[in-house]
């Protein structure tokens, strides 16, 4: 099925990439064109299969988030990207991305293209609010989206349905005169009209309807975050939310609260997290081979001893990798390798991907180290009580990653100067609705690019940037780091 899916999307892929290459060449670009893939790397167009690019944008965003969070010593982060239509979630643990989807579904088709695990749901700024008649006219938000055209009602491009963005405008969070840095004016009256129309059957006015939309979408996104972290065996409260996407910073406090998380990171590249992430990628190729290998026999109490067989499989994959490294124009000594093994206890149907501590094995002690790494990872995910050593320990798939480092822009570190007051960035005030404060309150509005390292902003407050709006709800505090990231903390 993987080959069929790849063949089906290959034609459109080639047409678009060929047009892009021609356009770049005509504009004087002479260097190779690199494309992002769904395993967190990039490669030349000539070395890329169409199916390997599926979902590459959110994967790039996740990789960019991991890069930024390592700079701020935040090891456990849940990456989120709330755009106009979808809400993407990925998990970073100990500063690394280790969770993969071994059989990702493309449209309705199950494929065998290993990809970094990203979960997406229909939730974003363009998500349409509606009343579900099957549930007594209960308010639902999404998965349908107004898209960019006609978009939310406030875009004034023909859209009539109330969306999350319309709710944010009516609640005062988004300034209609400063959307996209003032490049696009929003029509608040159209937003009010759409919300009133939606609230007719429930008896809500436009403000109540807007508040209910916010609560539903925040809960929906927060539940998805909680589920993704908890089902991987982690404690959600130990994670920091990375608020990405144009709508992410606007709803970050609400969704973090719903996910029981008390810290958020909002970098200045939030709205373009995927594009930024692409600039942080190195060239990565993946090679794999299925071969059942029993590493530990519980009944006999013996470990695997055919070291030559194990090493020959790894060597076979390594030779393929070196071939591609040379074809990419690099030397063999510029490449680094990482071996991942899909392992399980005997008679289990589910495999656990484990990073091998060794590329090759030469002794029983080496085999034991690999088995111990599997036991450690399995116990972390499912608890030690779920371990089943009586079934023995097996490898089903060998997967080799090869990395070629590319130059990247360094992250600028600013000196903390002066007092923590952000008064130099205060641009005004406007009325905003805060449920915890029981209504509309006059609220400070700050300009993002005027903030300095060390500035502290107590909620409620708003930080406006050209491509997003950061909503700091009551009970939250934002502190600007030396990298000029906003770190929002919940005041307990």
Outline where the language-model segments fall.
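Glycine-rich phosphate-binding loop of actin/hexokinase-like ATP-binding domains
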Residues: 45, 49-56, 60-172, 253-295
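C-terminal, non-catalytic interaction/recognition modules in large multi-subunit enzymes and RNPs
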Residues: 74, 84, 124, 136, ...
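Short, flexible loop segments at the rims of nucleotide/cofactor-binding pockets, characterized by
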Residues: 55, 242-243
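Short, contiguous clusters of charged residues that form electrostatic/catalytic patches at enzyme active sites
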Residues: 15-18, 22, 60-63, 67, ...
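Gly/Ser/Thr-rich active-site cleft segment
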Residues: 1-58, 149-198
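N-terminal glycine/serine-rich phosphate-binding loop of ATP-dependent small-molecule kinases
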Residues: 4, 15-54, 72-76, 93-101, ...
